[in-house]
């Protein structure tokens, strides 16, 4: 049975993963780690580590992992380029899976949105994400991943075409503009819409998560799979084989 360490165990996702592991037949909890814990013990007792912490927590985890390489599943969002570079470097000596969303449905949404962006080149693209009032970052990491995918499908640099808000007399919408908008309220687990709009018709691709268990179960499946992989960076597409 695979021993999974939970890094960021006191957070919403950490608690959900702990709960889902109680009924998992292929894996069990090795240790619950949170800020101020013993990193050495976490690595010694775990076959795989799942990280849902904070950017600073992920940074600390990656630095320590170089001394005791273990497969890492990283789902922390809001990571900057420095941390992403550190992650890429660390993947030379251990398998690392990184995704802003562990839902298999979101992975398919991302795939379909990329294909639609390529096929519907004259359609305007707008992305809307909705989350609970407690979410700290905006736009969500998932929304940004979707935006990157649809921009790449059209050979566009997202940084040059992304819009995050509209107010006042701003003129007409530009052809390549990709809007990424955020709503916050209540206890919404997560909803993402990628819309393609043209005169006379529009297509909207939606994904709604109704429980954090969706993400937790996805992370556990990925952790079990990653434990058998060689050292390199992996994405949700590698896991799904698409």
Curated annotation (Swiss-Prot):
Alphabetized SUPFAM superfamilies for the sequence? Glyceraldehyde-3-phosphate dehydrogenase-like, C-terminal domain, NAD(P)-binding Rossmann-fold domains
Q: Which GO terms describe its biological process?
A: diaminopimelate biosynthetic process; lysine biosynthetic process via diaminopimelate
Q: Which residues bind NAD(+)?
A: 8-13, 75-77, 99-102
Specify the species. Campylobacter jejuni subsp. jejuni serotype O:2 (strain ATCC 700819 / NCTC 11168)
What gene name does this entry carry? dapB
Residues forming the catalytic site: 131, 135
Write out the pathway annotation from the protein's UniProt entry.
Amino-acid biosynthesis; L-lysine biosynthesis via DAP pathway; (S)-tetrahydrodipicolinate from L-aspartate: step 4/4
Biological role: Catalyzes the conversion of 4-hydroxy-tetrahydrodipicolinate (HTPA) to tetrahydrodipicolinate.
Keywords for this protein: Amino-acid biosynthesis, Cytoplasm, Diaminopimelate biosynthesis, Lysine biosynthesis, NAD, NADP, Oxidoreductase
Q: What is its main location?
A: cytoplasm
Catalysed conversion reaction: (S)-2,3,4,5-tetrahydrodipicolinate + NAD(+) + H2O = (2S,4S)-4-hydroxy-2,3,4,5-tetrahydrodipicolinate + NADH + H(+); (S)-2,3,4,5-tetrahydrodipicolinate + NADP(+) + H2O = (2S,4S)-4-hydroxy-2,3,4,5-tetrahydrodipicolinate + NADPH + H(+)
Protein name in the entry: 4-hydroxy-tetrahydrodipicolinate reductase
Q: What is its EC number?
A: 1.17.1.8
Q: Which family does it belong to?
A: Belongs to the DapB family.
Give the Gene Ontology MF terms in alphabetical order. 4-hydroxy-tetrahydrodipicolinate reductase; NAD binding; NADP binding; oxidoreductase activity, acting on CH or CH2 groups, NAD or NADP as acceptor
Task: Name the domain of life.
Answer: Bacteria
Q: Name the Pfam families on file.
A: DapB_C, DapB_N
List residues binding (S)-2,3,4,5-tetrahydrodipicolinate.
Answer: 132, 141-142
Its localization reads: Cytoplasm
Q: Which GO terms describe its cellular component?
A: cytosol
């Amino acid at each position: 049975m695979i021993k999974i360490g939970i890094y960021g165990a006191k957070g919403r996702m950490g608690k959900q993963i702990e709960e889902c592991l109680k009924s998992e037949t292929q894996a069990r909890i090795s240790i619950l780690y949170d800020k101020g814990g013993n990193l050495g013990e976490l690595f010694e007792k775990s076959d795989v580590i799942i990280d849902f912490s904070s950017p600073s927590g992920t940074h600390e985890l990656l630095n320590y992992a170089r001394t005791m390489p273990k497969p890492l599943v990283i789902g922390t969002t809001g990571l900057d380029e420095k941390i992403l570079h550190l992650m890429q470097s660390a993947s030379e000596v251990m398998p690392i899976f990184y995704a802003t969303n562990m839902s298999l449905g979101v992975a398919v949404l991302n795939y379909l949105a990329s294909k639609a962006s390529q096929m519907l080149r004259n359609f305007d693209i707008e992305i809307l994400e909705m989350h609970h009032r407690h979410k700290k970052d905006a736009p969500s990491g998932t929304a940004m991943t979707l935006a990157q995918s649809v921009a790449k499908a059209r050979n566009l640099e997202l940084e040059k075409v992304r819009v995050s808000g509209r107010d006042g007399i701003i003129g007409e919408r530009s052809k390549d503009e990709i809007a990424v908008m955020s709503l916050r309220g209540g206890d919404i687990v997560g909803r993402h819409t990628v819309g393609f709009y043209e005169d006379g018709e529009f297509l909207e691709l939606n994904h709604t998560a109704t429980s954090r268990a969706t993400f937790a179960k996805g992370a556990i499946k990925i952790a079990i799979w990653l434990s058998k992989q060689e050292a390199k960076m992996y994405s949700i597409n590698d896991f799904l084989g698409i």
